[in-house]
Amino acid sequence: MAANDTIADMLTRIRNANMARHQTTLVPATKMTRSIAKVLQEEGFIAEISEEGDEVKRNLVIALKYKGKNRQPLITALKRVSKPGLRVYSNRKELPRVLGGIGIAIISTSSGIMTDREARRQNVGGEVLCYVW
């Protein structure tokens, strides 16, 4: 089944796998999902990313991270901000802070997909894709 909003689909799959305490989850591989997964890995929210499948139908295998004996998920929440029906843009001066800097906002900029902190450092704005904390 083709998803209209691949980012929301990815976030939902990660959220559901986290709640079920799964080790990994599969996400359809696109340029956008690869970039978002790479940012999540760099920020320490997920453990590992790999690809599987043939050329036509590739999937990202995302290994999730948990902490402690009770296996509490590192990702508390994922929230889609900019949606296909209502895009949300932010200039460099108005980039959002998530929970006072504890969480991250993932921004799609002209320089690629990056966190809000990196966008501030590079002095660029863009489309606010999602919040992760």
UniProtKB/Swiss-Prot annotation:
Keywords: Ribonucleoprotein, Ribosomal protein, RNA-binding, rRNA-binding. This is Small ribosomal subunit protein uS8. Gene3D superfamilies: 3.30.1370.30, 3.30.1490.10. One of the primary rRNA binding proteins, it binds directly to 16S rRNA central domain where it helps coordinate assembly of the platform of the 30S subunit. Part of the 30S ribosomal subunit. Contacts proteins S5 and S12. InterPro entries: Ribosomal_uS8, Ribosomal_uS8_CS, Ribosomal_uS8_sf. It comes from the Bacteria. It comes from Nostoc sp. (strain PCC 7120 / SAG 25.82 / UTEX 2576).
